A protein has these predicted regions:
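Strand-loop microenvironment adjacent to phosphate/nucleotide-handling motifs in alpha/beta enzyme folds
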Residues: 108-325
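Hydrophobic/aromatic anchor residues within beta-strands of the central parallel beta-sheet
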Residues: 19, 61, 84, 121-124, ...
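Proline-aspartate-enriched helix->loop->beta-strand connector
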Residues: 34-43, 51, 81
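Short secondary-structure boundary/capping segments
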Residues: 8, 36, 58-60, 100-105, ...
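Conserved Rossmann-fold NAD(P)-dependent oxidoreductase catalytic core, especially the SDR/UDP-sugar
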Residues: 48-107, 112-114
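Conserved residues in the N-terminal Rossmann fold of short-chain dehydrogenase/reductase
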Residues: 20-21, 63, 154, 217
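Conserved sequence/active-site signature of Rossmann-fold short-chain dehydrogenase/reductase
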Residues: 25, 92, 129-131
Length: 325
């Protein structure tokens, strides 16, 4: 907050900026702020976003991400906000971790709220934002600078990437296009192999992979899946005026059902002494598309191995075919 405020004041000295410290979990504080300033637009970006940390502290993901989003969405409705944009993630699609499941629940919260409010609620799904805090590129650069190793969790792991200008553009375009209930998705091109990204960054530094800088495969972390997705199978895509921004057609979940799931989670997090198995069971009730990473990754690896066998067999058959004279 301190650095953001300094930067904004330096760039826009005539802009009226109010920096306010608070938590989305503190509804009374939120109501005081909304009551005083009556925001016309709300961009809701507050969230715990790191997958491994939320696997260790799953109840915090529910409290901050889900219940915090409900609090802000309620205040936007109560105090007459015109438009509310939720920052979501591709990890919300068929989630394999608590963080992704919590963000999918956030999408459901704002879509349910949109059905009963004059405020227009929409969401944008981000991929990995290049150069942002906690992203893989600054980490790799730091590891290269320190002489390695560069750590990659799996040789086949891929991710969708977007630049900071693309991310900002997606949010602003979503704000102008939103009519209420949409989930906006950016065409980010083909997913990038993280291993290939590590190799490229080492070479761009004038060094040789596995000669000057070793690449270490560390193993998938809890909740981490090999491939991210932009859409659930039930969602379709609609075009917008922008040729790289699309709208995922919303799934029709009754608002009453979503509210019931939120209250179930709210009641569940009142006590802390839950096992991980109990937590995942409740999260699966709230987010039926949640599948544990180990199960998802096993299916992907098996499918890939089957494809490789088929390709090898086809090549062998091709080699055995009689050559034309």
């Amino acid at each position: 907050m301190y650095n953001i405020e300094l930067e904004l004041r330096a760039k826009y000295p005539n802009l009226n900026i109010k920096g306010i410290i608070g938590s989305v979990r503190d509804k009374k504080k939120l109501e005081d702020v909304f009551s005083k300033y009556k925001p016309y637009l709300v961009f809701h970006a507050a969230a715990h976003k790191h997958v491994p940390l939320m696997e260790v502290s799953p109840l915090e993901a529910i409290k901050n991400n889900v219940l915090g989003t409900q609090n802000v969405a309620d205040c936007a409705d109560k105090f007459g906000t015109k438009r509310f944009i939720l920052i979501s993630t591709d990890k919300a699609v068929n989630p394999t971790n608590i963080m992704g499941a919590s963000k999918r629940m956030c999408e459901m919260v704002i879509q349910a709220k949109n059905k009963t409010s004059k405020t227009e609620y929409a969401a944008v799904r981000f991929g990995n934002v290049l150069g942002s805090n906690g992203s893989v590129v600054p980490l790799f650069k730091k590891q290269i600078k320190e002489g390695g190793p560069v750590t990659v969790t799996h040789k086949d792991i891929t991710r969708f990437f977007m630049t900071i200008p693309e991310a900002v553009g997606l949010v602003l375009q979503a704000m102008t296009y939103a009519k209420g209930g949409e989930v906006f998705v950016l065409d980010m091109g083909e997913p990038v192999k993280i291993y290939d990204l590590a190799v490229s960054l080492i070479k761009l530094s004038g060094l040789q992979p596995d000669i000057d800088i070793p690449i270490e495969i560390t193993g998938l972390r809890p909740g981490e899946k090999l491939y991210e997705e932009l859409l659930m199978s039930e969602e379709g895509l609609e075009h917008t005026k922008h040729n790289k921004i699309f709208v995922a057609e919303p799934l029709d979940i009754p608002a009453e059902e979503v509210n019931k799931r939120v209250e179930m989670l709210r009641e569940f997090v009142q006590t802390e002494n839950h096992t991980m198995e109990e937590i995942k069971k409740v999260v699966k009730k709230a987010v039926p598309t949640f599948v544990e990473a180990e199960e998802k990754n096993k299916k992907i690896i098996n499918y890939k191995q089957e494809l490789e066998k088929i390709e090898a067999r086809q090549m062998q058959e091709h080699e055995l075919m009689p050559k034309e004279a």
